[in-house]
UniProtKB/Swiss-Prot annotation:
GO molecular function, one term: rRNA binding
Name of the protein this chain belongs to: Small ribosomal subunit protein eS4
Similarity comment text for this entry: Belongs to the eukaryotic ribosomal protein eS4 family.
Keyword RNA-binding: yes
Classification via SUPFAM superfamilies: Alpha-L RNA-binding motif (SSF55174)
Keyword Glycoprotein carried by entry: no
Length: 243
C-alpha cells in the first residue's frame, strides 16, 4: 500500500511530555508543522497564546489574535498557529511590551521565561555543523534549522558546538562563545535538564561514543551530561537571563 504522506493529526495522549497541556480534557492536539524545531523540543504557537499566556479561551480566538499579527517570534510576525516555537526562541507581544524566551525547566517542560526588551533582540544559536558552499564561503547550520553564511577567512572562528549570539531579526552575529573549559552552559535535555554551570572537563571517547562534559553548578556540585545537551550561554557568566 502506498504512503499517504506525513501525519497531520496528533492525539493529546501522544503529544510530547514537554508540553504544558491538559491531556485528558480533549482527544486531539495541534500538531506543529515541520519547521525550525522538531516536535519534541518545540510547541505550537497556538498553545503559547491560549494555554501558556491565557490571551484566548478557544483555539478560534487564538487564531484570530495571531492573524492580526500581534505575536512575534524572533522579531518576525508569525500568523501560523501551528508554527513550532522551540528552545531559545523569543516570543514578543509589542502591544503589552512582554518578551519571553522558551526554555526547559527541571522536569523537562517547556516554559516561557520573562526577559527584558534589550535581551529580546539576542538569540543564542548552537552550531550543529558547517559546510563549504559555492563562492569560497562557509555555511553555519544552527540548532533551530536556520543557517548563516560567512567568508572562508572566518571559518576557523566557528566550530561545532560553539554558540553564536545573533541579533534578531537582522541576523547579525554579535559574539561567538566557544565550547571549552570554563564556558558557562545550560543543559537542554537529559536527566540534568535546566541545570547550569561551568565546564570543568570535556571527555572524548573513541568508536563513535558520544562525548561527555563535567559541569560544576553554582553550588559547587559536579555532574555529567552529554556534550550534545550542553548549550554554551556565556564565558564567565551567562549572556542571557536563565530560570
Amino acid at each position: 500500500m502506498a504512503r499517504k504522506g506525513p501525519k497531520r493529526h496528533l492525539k493529546r495522549l501522544a503529544a510530547p511530555t514537554s508540553w504544558y497541556i491538559e491531556r485528558k480534557a480533549y482527544k486531539w492536539a495541534v500538531r506543529p508543522r515541520p519547521g525550525p524545531h522538531n516536535m519534541r523540543t518545540s510547541i505550537p504557537l497556538l498553545y503559547i497564546v491560549r494555554d501558556y499566556l491565557g490571551y484566548a479561551k478557544t483555539a478560534r480566538e487564538a487564531r484570530k489574535i495571531l492573524n492580526e499579527g500581534k505575536f512575534l517570534v524572533d522579531g518576525r510576525v508569525r500568523k501560523d498557529y501551528k508554527f513550532p516555537v522551540g528552545i531559545m526562541d523569543v516570543v514578543s507581544i509589542p502591544e503589552t511590551g512582554e518578551h519571553y524566551r522558551v526554555l526547559p525547566n527541571r522536569i523537562g517542560k517547556l516554559i516561557l521565561h520573562p526577559i527584558s526588551e534589550d535581551e529580546a533582540f539576542i538569540k543564542p544559536l548552537r552550531i550543529r555543523n558547517k559546510r563549504m558552499i559555492k563562492g569560497a564561503r562557509v555555511q553555519l547550520n544552527f540548532h533551530d534549522g536556520t543557517n548563516h553564511i560567512v567568508s572562508i577567512a572566518e571559518k576557523d572562528n566557528y566550530f561545532t558546538s560553539y554558540t553564536v549570539l545573533m541579533k534578531v531579526p537582522e541576523r547579525e552575529i554579535l559574539e561567538v562563545l566557544p565550547f571549552e573549559k570554563g564556558a558557562y552552559v545550560f543543559v537542554t535535555q537529559g536527566k540534568n535538564v535546566a541545570r547550569k554551570g561551568r565546564i570543568v572537563e570535556i571527555k572524548r571517547f573513541p568508536m563513535g561514543w558520544p562525548d561527555v562534559v563535567t559541569i560544576e553548578d553554582e553550588e559547587g556540585e559536579l555532574f555529567d551530561t552529554l556534550k550534545e545537551y550542553a548549550f554554551v550561554v556565556g564565558t564567565d557568566k551567562p549572556k542571557i537571563s536563565l530560570p
